[in-house]
Amino acid sequence: DTIKVLSYNVRIFNAYGWIPQLKKETIYNYLKKENADILCIQEFYVKDEIPEMNYKYHHIGKQSKKSKWHMAIYSKYKQINKATVTINGEKMNNTCIFSDIIINNDTIRVYNIHLASNWFKESDYYFINNPNKEKIYNNINAVVNKMKKTYKSRAIEALAIRKHMNNSPYPVIVCGDFNDTPMSYAYKKIKGNLDDSFSKSGQGIGSSFVKIPALRIDYILYDKKFKSTNYKKDNIILSD
């Protein structure tokens, strides 16, 4: 059987107007039009749930210990087990949730992941895309120091997620915003022997982060029992 899986960091549905004139209904309509069988979304407020999408089953998890943001796994198929991955019993700074989903007579486990953000400022992104020779030393130090701290956080999160995945009784599909590149430790640790849907059936460079063109930080990975036939990244700007 064929199932359609969609992963999207909706950036709290543009609640603070980062993208001028973009209304949350536009994002809803896009998700509704895509009509995925399994939808994983990151970064949204609970009040902005999307019941009009008519997904019968969902799992909503709080995104971090302190954050008011949440993430969710919506599906057209029954979810029989839902939980949050923890580190030594504690929630991560960011979150990984999972649902066990019955599709016909088979059960799969779907993980939705959002690893630690780099917390770059707009000035950091500007420097990355437009390096200033006169200020390059200070700017590089600022960017590198942030990356060192969050790189370590993502590594710890990735280790916990991989440990949890190793004990899954079902074949897995992993969706999410890793905030890191395919060369990173976090990506490689989580991926393990899974296949990458972009690598298997995508085209182009697969960039997924508007602020740094050509950067891929969002992924759909899957067990080798599955096959990716049509990876697609829409060229729309409804989030970052």
Report the location of each language-model feature.
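N-terminal, active-site-proximal structural segment of metallo-dependent hydrolase catalytic domains
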Residues: 1-52, 158
